[in-house]
Amino acid sequence: MSELALDPVLDPALDFVSCPDPNGTHRMAYWSWGESSASHVVVCVHGLTRQGRDFDLLARSLVASAKKANLPAIRVVCPDVVGRGQSEWLKDPMAYHFAQYAGDMAVLLQSLHAQQAIERLDWVGTSMGGVIGMLLAAQPLPTPIRRLVLNDIGPVVSWASILNMKNYVGKVGRFQSLQDAANAMWEISKSFGPHTSEEWLALSKHMVRTLEDGALALHYDPAIGVPVRAVTQEKAQAGEAALWQVYDLIACPTLLIHGALSELLSLSAVQDMQQRGPRAQVATIQGVGHAPTLTHEDQIDIVRRFLGLHA
């Protein structure tokens, strides 16, 4: 884990943006690091059942690196996708889909641009967050994505991984302590790669909410599992074909971080991503599956260098 993890630091700022949905509106939370007046914004978006605080170490490191390199200040924004973390839940479970998520992020970008004109926009997306990034990178945004980081995700998601998601997504559990919750999460997250107990506890503490009786549960709407369980192989294949069309429209420099042991993203898919669309650069993380947590210094440095935030 990065040495920055040991430095005392203030918590990031928490804010909200109102986003439309089929039943009205909902509030989406986002965490901000760095200078709110910065014109260079890096958006980091998490995986399916995670939340924005997954990027604490990466965000702190990127902000510090820009300062150390005497580069213009940056702002790192890490949203909680609707239904996760501090964001509100949707009334209709079937509204948890990528069109909704991408629309929410477009609203967020519009809000950030109104606060301070964005001149440079970069995107770091883990798994689901990477798919959202691909959808936006293929669109003519007011400020186009300058550089796109896809963390162990592409147009192809293996059917075995989808079956695995069907088994656990939506099971928020009930735990008597943070340690109990962390232990349970580790059982389904070992593919994230080696972490010390301290590192894993740090990643877990923002993943739980307190119930009325004092017990803990995972901090997301169990209903996000409903559309996951509704996915058939035919729907998955159609989604894959559509995402390849999206990927082929991406023109910005793209970095694919690939967990060498990933069950979700195959080597053949990685090779196709190197040949199609933006012809992604690939950084392979040995000993890690789906997905690298971007909390260890070697992983952080890959992102830092691709975004040009190193001395």
Which functions belong to the PLM regions below?
Residues 100-119:
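Conserved acidic catalytic loop of the alpha/beta-hydrolase fold
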